[in-house]
């Protein structure tokens, strides 16, 4: 196959799609170049599904090679290791809009690999990777209802929406949003914002959808010219005989089971009914069906039952209407020795959230393609199996936990004080102790509460809510505060976090085409109503940050020293600063501009360290009396140390009013004496007097 290249303009960027030159054994491969950012995207699809598989095994791997930025990896092995958090999050970002576009019943394994091979360090390669994924799938012949387009959107009050902003532009942007979708519909939104209105957020989504039509047109042109033949694959026909048989026998019982409001009781009853279905209809004899097929059809009936009830206006699974938030229980200060803690319970979803304050040294060091940087705010989300009443894997966080933690972080990050205002490192951990829908939004609420309990001066409380959608034909229902089952059986997962003034995070995943602007407006409106309700209840428990930090939190003192004095504080090989830290049990961070941050487990420890630093950096003041130590005696006087590293000369004539023949008649090395600073010359030499001390003290110096 000869290489095929397609070039198009995408906003201010020139994008080139090339196939047929690299990775030709993959089912589909495209090299995307977008303003000096190049990403190689490959797609491989298995020709047949594995025996007995009942799920679609799609995997997306986004990887950043350090050579792309002209760097060699750190560490002992000097090669890329496990995926970074950024790589994991981008893999999820690509997965989410493409997964719903594979046909129902398609069980062949598909693997997408996006490799960043060159970057200009000025913009995120994720949009190029998403464009490449769309193109590689479009030319592969694999059943896929694409192509998709993707765009990043920024917002500036004076400029308006910005298409695919650079890192530099994002610094002054009050929005960072990624949108992906097809020609007709938006499928995925991921964003963080600085209290933008619902209308501004919706406008950004629609702006992105209009702009990425250029991507979709270019991918279609590439597929027309270089696409492989479409696979001869047909979706398995629905077994209407089995569907009707199970519905006739158990349909009413399934419907009744979905009126049980307690999750575990409902699951137990549905499990019994599923077992009955298998016992009645599964087997190898004539007229029977495989057990796996019976279970699949039973699940299909569950899906249809719940959806029909909702769109026809019947009460939801737990008896609520479409706009009601589950009952809340909010507690703060629940863990005695932590810096800040909260227990947030919404129905059968519960998060125990803890905030911890640390020193500047506790900040996370991130090694990215753009270089190393520090992150002084971390939010970690843990989802243990006991939260859903199951046994399961324990260990390092999975992709879902990393993604949910990042969403919760986005929700509260805009409300945090700056490092200048509050120079602590902040770590928030959300332990999901019960889960039945929207645990990430419970984490947002719990994080806001825990931060205020810790005394972190957040700008405003933040709450989050998850919305759902069920759409059947022209009928639809937007659901507030969805349950786990409603998430699984619905058509949309729409999460909104924000303050009473505006949105701080919006995440949307849509499983169907045809989500209209009207539906998104209704969802945002209901989310605002629910968010204000939750904030009102949170404010009854704690409405503003505590006036003082927890007594368990480290004390932090700030000061500024002359940058020329930094080496004096650090000492030879770090000896001086190390001695101060060891002796006072405090830690000291010094910036190049002379900013000093001192952290101590107690106020006394921090103050002691501060006094030591002050003593080292202090300058001798003319007319001030010091208590010094005689360091060295010479014929013409004595050198007295009055400050760390600062000696002054007491001339023999300044020792006493009486005539002295030998200095050693009056002074000895190591002797403590009071001295008065007479003068400091332009070379820093200090002239001292002992004999004038008495007169100076008498005059009140």
Curated annotation (Swiss-Prot):
Cofactor: Mg(2+)
Enzyme Commission number(s) from the entry: 2.7.7.8
Annotated KH domain residues: 554-613
Record carries keyword Metal-binding: yes
Residue positions binding Mg(2+): 487, 493
Location within or outside the cell: Cytoplasm
Gene3D superfamilies in the record: GHMP Kinase, N-terminal domain, K Homology domain, type 1, Nucleic acid-binding proteins
Keywords associated with the record: Cytoplasm, Magnesium, Metal-binding, Nucleotidyltransferase, RNA-binding, Transferase
S1 motif domain span: 623-691
GO molecular function, one term: RNA binding
Alphabetical list of SMART domains matching this protein: KH (SM00322), S1 (SM00316)
Swiss-Prot/TrEMBL GO biological process terms: mRNA catabolic process; RNA processing
Catalytic activity annotation: RNA(n+1) + phosphate = RNA(n) + a ribonucleoside 5'-diphosphate
Broad enzyme group: transferase
Gene Ontology cellular component list: cytosol
Its biological purpose: Involved in mRNA degradation. Catalyzes the phosphorolysis of single-stranded polyribonucleotides processively in the 3'- to 5'-direction.
Subunit structure comment from the entry: Component of the RNA degradosome, which is a multiprotein complex involved in RNA processing and mRNA degradation.
HAMAP family, alphabetized: PNPase (MF_01595)
Homology family: Belongs to the polyribonucleotide nucleotidyltransferase family.
Record protein name field: Polyribonucleotide nucleotidyltransferase
Organism: Pseudomonas paraeruginosa (strain DSM 24068 / PA7)
């Amino acid at each position: 196959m000869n290489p095929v290249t397609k070039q198009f303009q995408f906003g201010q960027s020139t994008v080139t799609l090339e196939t047929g030159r690299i990775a030709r054994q993959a089912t589909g491969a495209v090299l995307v170049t977008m303003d000096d950012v190049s990403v190689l995207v490959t797609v491989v699809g298995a020709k047949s599904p594995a025996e007995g598989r009942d799920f679609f095994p799609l995997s997306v791997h986004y990887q950043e090679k350090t050579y792309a930025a002209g760097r060699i990896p750190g560490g002992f092995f000097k090669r890329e290791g496990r995926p970074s958090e950024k790589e994991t999050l981008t893999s999820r970002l690509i997965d989410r809009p493409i997964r719903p576009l594979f046909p129902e019943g398609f069980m062949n394994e598909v693997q997408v690999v996006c490799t960043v091979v060159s970057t200009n360090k000025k913009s995120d390669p994720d949009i190029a990777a998403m464009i490449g994924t769309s193109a590689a799938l479009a030319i592969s012949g694999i059943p896929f209802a694409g192509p998709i387009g993707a765009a990043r959107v920024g917002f500036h009050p004076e400029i308006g929406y910005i298409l695919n902003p650079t890192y530099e532009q994002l610094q002054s942007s009050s929005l960072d949003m990624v949108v992906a979708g097809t020609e007709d519909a938006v499928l995925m939104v991921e964003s963080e914002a600085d209290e933008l209105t619902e209308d501004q957020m919706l406008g950004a989504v629609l702006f992105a959808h209009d702009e990425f039509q250029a991507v979709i047109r270019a991918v279609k042109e590439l597929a027309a010219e270089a696409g492989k033949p479409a696979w001869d694959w047909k979706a398995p026909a629905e077994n209407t005989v089995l569907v009707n048989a199970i519905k006739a026998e158990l349909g009413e019982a399934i419907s009744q089971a979905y009126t049980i409001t307690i999750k575990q009781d409902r699951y137990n009853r549905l499990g019994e009914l599923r077992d009955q279905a298998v016992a009645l209809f599964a087997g190898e004899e004539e007229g029977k069906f495989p057990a796996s097929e019976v279970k699949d059809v039973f699940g299909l009936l569950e899906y249809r039952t719940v959806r029909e009830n909702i769109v026809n206006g019947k009460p939801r699974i737990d008896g609520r209407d479409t706009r009601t938030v589950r009952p809340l229980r909010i507690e703060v200060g629940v863990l005695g020795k932590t810096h800040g803690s909260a227990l947030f319970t919404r129905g059968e979803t519960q998060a125990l959230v803890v905030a911890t304050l640390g020193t500047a040294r506790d900040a996370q060091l991130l090694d990215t393609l753009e270089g190393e940087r520090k992150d002084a705010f971390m939010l970690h989300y843990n989802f243990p199996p006991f939260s859903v009443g199951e046994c399961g894997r324990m260990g390092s966080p999975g992709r879902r936990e990393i993604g949910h933690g990042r969403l919760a972080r986005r929700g509260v990050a805009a409300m945090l004080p700056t490092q200048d205002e509050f120079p602590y490192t902040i770590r928030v951990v959300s332990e999901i102790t019960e889960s039945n829908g929207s645990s990430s939004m419970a984490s947002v609420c719990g994080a806001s509460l825990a931060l205020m309990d810790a005394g972190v001066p957040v700008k405003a409380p933040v709450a989050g809510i998850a919305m759902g959608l069920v759409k059947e034909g022209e009928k639809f229902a937007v659901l507030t505060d969805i349950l786990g089952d409603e998430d699984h059986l619905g058509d949309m997962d729409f999460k909104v976090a924000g303050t009473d003034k505006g949105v701080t995070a919006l995440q949307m995943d849509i499983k169907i085409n045809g989500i209209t602007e009207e539906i998104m407006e209704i969802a945002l409106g209901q989310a605002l109503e629910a968010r204000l309700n939750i904030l009102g209840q949170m404010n009854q428990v704690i409405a503003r940050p505590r006036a003082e930090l927890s007594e368990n939190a480290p004390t932090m003192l700030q000061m500024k020293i002359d940058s020329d004095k930094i080496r004096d504080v650090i000492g030879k090989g770090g000896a001086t600063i190390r001695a101060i830290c060891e002796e006072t049990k405090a830690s000291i961070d010094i910036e190049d501009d002379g900013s000093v941050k001192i952290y101590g487990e107690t106020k006394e420890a921090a103050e002691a360290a501060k006094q030591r630093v002050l003593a080292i950096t202090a300058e001798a003041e003319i007319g001030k009396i010091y208590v010094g130590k005689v360091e060295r005696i010479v014929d013409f006087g004595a050198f007295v140390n009055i400050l760390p590293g600062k000696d002054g000369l007491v001339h023999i004539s300044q020792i006493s009013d009486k005539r002295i023949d030998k200095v050693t008649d009056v002074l000895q090395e190591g002797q403590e004496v009071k001295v008065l600073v007479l003068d400091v010359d332009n070379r820093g030499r200090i002239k001292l007097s002992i004999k004038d001390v008495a007169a100076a003290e008498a005059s009140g110096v």
